[in-house]
Amino acid sequence: MLSAVLCLGLLSPEIRDSDFWWHLRTGQYIVETRSLPVPDPFAYTTAAAPSAYAGEDAVRRFNLTHEWLAQALVYAAYRAAGFPGVVMLRALLLAAFCGLAGWVAWRRSGVLDRGWMAGLAAAAIAVPFALDRPQLFTYLFLALTMAILESRRRLWLLPFLFLIWANCHGGFFLGWVVLAAYCAEALVARLRHRPLAEERALWLCSAGAVLASGINPNGFRAVQVLLLYRSSAMQSYLLEWARPALWPPPLFALLLAAAAGTMVWARRTVRMSDWLLLAAFAAAAFIAERNTIFVGFFAPVFLASYLPWKRALPALAGWVAAAALAAGIVWGATAGDFFELRAAEWRYPSGAADFLASHQVTDRMFNTYEYGGYLMWRLWPRERVFIDGRALSERVFDDYARILYNHDNAGGKNAAQLLDQYGANVIVMDTFEYATGTVYLLAPAIATTAQSEWKLVYRDAQALIWMRHPPAGVTPLNPMEVFSQMEDACGLHLDREPGRPRCARSLAQSYAKIREFTRARRWLGIYLDHPHAPDPEAEQAYREYVNAGK
């Protein structure tokens, strides 16, 4: 019970994912119109976007439709219980994923202690994945698939499970991998004249599950689309599709190494299906950061299965473990990190959305990628967005990057020409990519360029609004307030996420470029005062500022 409460607490942070908002709006659209969002009703750039590569139209349709059931369920949770309902739905889905890891580990090892420890190990890996996205259903259904296959009871449920899964998220093909591993094990056992129990039911139900997963808006295109994802330049910009960093060793890599080592040690007793699953999901984890959560399921299960020591913990150790779990629950509750049944409004441009809504602005806008979903939720149908996290068009994304980073004419149209081409009369943007600290150069470029076309009409710590034609009664702000906004924005993120200080480094560089050396030194000092990777270049620059008295 204590481990279950701890898991729920760990997996219930506030809603902090920018993609959540477009999933929520899409779910509302599906529920209220009883139709799929095809063609795209939310972004004005989608319809006219030319295909950048063969197959992009199929990818676009897939991205618009493959999560429809999960999106409708998330919206239903929101409509029933607001943001607390969404947070608890996510926590329960992930806790069930971890609980199934514990159940399978317990069933295989026969040791209850191994079960709850495997569940907690899965939870430790799952914490960064506590995001309100449809792939939560893939995590749960993958775990359910293995649990059903392990018990060999109710194999007839597999086709129904895969039917639901294939309409919640395109990751249902990962279930095929699990089915294939168990079917291959059964086939080899049959060839060795040692047939496994329920082998006929296993093959029939697995075949039924694969066929049932084709009953969705895209049929069996998920694998084709995945291959197209890997060749997409746009996907290469998304951090979740990047290969995971392996130094210092992350927790998933340590668990994977421990599981692999244990299986090699016990190789004579390791099941064929386990070797296949370890290899398949280890490969997936090394290909993309987003896949590392699956190691959090399989590695603890395999560790519990093959560790040679089978005894339960001594009574004293059990009491110590219970005390540690209770202390963790108390710490999380008192620190305010557990059961945060709200949206992290500080991350989103709520003030900017209020401004646009109150002035009934309907002009086309250019917006930053991470704000597209929130603006879609707040402003549609009066306003449609330029871009959002659905990643629907390679060409639009290329133009977006040229505008955002204020590219010149080299290699294509410059930012001003592209804004004219798209008919954008409003710009809603933040000024940093906080993971890397990269400055979005468009805003400081507009502020420091002699021009009268764009007026700064709104700014707070979350967003800036520039307009060509401000509403009546709105007095433009001093464009140099962009730099004050950048300071406010970076300061807010440092308060909330002190482990991501690179915006301060980039802000120092921005001030150095306009010869504001006092401010450059101040922000470089702030960066160096926060946790950061070794950065001799920044340390040298700071010493030079100090020695020069700047």
Each model region followed by its residue ranges:
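Membrane-interface alpha helices of multi-pass inner-membrane proteins
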Residues: 7, 122-126, 143-148, 156-170, ...
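Transmembrane-helix motifs of polytopic, lipid-linked glycan transferases
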Residues: 88-109
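Short hydrophobic/aromatic helix or loop-helix immediately within or flanking a transmembrane segment
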Residues: 45-84, 88
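Signature aromatic-anchored transmembrane alpha helix within multi-pass, membrane-resident enzymes
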Residues: 206-210, 301-332
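C-terminal luminal/periplasmic domains and tails of membrane-associated envelope-modifying transferases
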Residues: 337-343, 347-370, 380, 384, ...
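Short acidic/glycine- and proline-prone juxtamembrane loop motifs at membrane-interface regions
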Residues: 129-137
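Transmembrane catalytic cores of multi-pass membrane glycosyltransferases
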Residues: 31, 173-268, 296
